[in-house]
């Protein structure tokens, strides 16, 4: 069964779910709006330039959920996905997912966003399997820290390799869709790489364009 791999942010949805979630947290009053959005914007500029230390971004973006229960976060995420993310799902992405589903491919979203966001958005898209940044829990509460290898740049490849070994899968005939230069390590590994809404750094690479 060939794999169909998908980045999430700016590939399947219009925008970055972590940025959108940050704005949503300001609505909830979990963070001070002006300072938080200013710092988030600065960090995302580094991401766009390929210079972001993902650990720094995750430490910043997860601080507001530290000390909260997974159930509390899940309730907020459910509303967030329904109101904020769902209108941003690309119609072409839904059709692309369905084409791969009908072809019998195994669908997997692999994203550098937090697992509690990616899994919820994946369910909205009808994709149950995701690899994303895992968040540490202790005594029934989120700590605000990450756990394990981050699914970012080469980390996506390492996490995927571990998943392939666990699932008894290979990348033979695999397809991967992404918008970002940060996914070049994984784009270079699959048989059928496709760029979607590519950032400027991807435009100079000989990778197939796809309309997702």
Q: Over which residues does each language-model region extend?
A:
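C-terminal cap/substrate-recognition subdomain and adjoining C-terminal extension
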Residues: 1, 75, 82-211
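Active-site neighborhood of HAD-like aspartate-dependent phosphohydrolases
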Residues: 1-52
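Conserved active-site and cofactor/substrate-binding residues in soluble primary-metabolism enzymes
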Residues: 16, 68, 155
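Metal-dependent phosphoesterase signature
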Residues: 54-92
């Amino acid at each position: 069964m060939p794999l169909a791999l998908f980045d999430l942010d700016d590939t399947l949805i219009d925008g970055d779910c972590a940025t959108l979630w940050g704005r949503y947290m300001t609505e909830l009053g979990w963070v001070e709006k002006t300072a938080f959005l200013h710092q988030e914007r600065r960090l995302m500029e580094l991401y766009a330039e390929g210079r972001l230390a993902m650990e720094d971004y995750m430490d910043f973006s997860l601080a507001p959920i530290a000390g909260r229960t997974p159930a509390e976060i899940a309730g907020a995420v459910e509303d967030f996905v329904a109101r904020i993310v769902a209108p941003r799902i690309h119609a072409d992405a839904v059709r692309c997912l369905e084409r791969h589903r009908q072809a019998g491919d195994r669908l997997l979203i692999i994203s550098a966003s937090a697992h509690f966001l990616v899994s919820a958005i994946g369910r909205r898209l009808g994709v149950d399997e995701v690899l994303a940044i895992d968040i540490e829990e202790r005594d029934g509460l989120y700590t605000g820290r990450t756990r394990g290898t981050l699914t970012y740049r080469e980390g996506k490849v390492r996490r995927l390799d571990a998943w392939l070994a666990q699932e008894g899968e290979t990348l033979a005939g695999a397809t991967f869709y992404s918008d970002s230069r940060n996914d070049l390590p994984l784009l270079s590994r699959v048989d059928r790489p496709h760029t979607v809404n590519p950032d400027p750094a991807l435009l100079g690479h000989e990778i197939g364009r796809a309309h997702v």
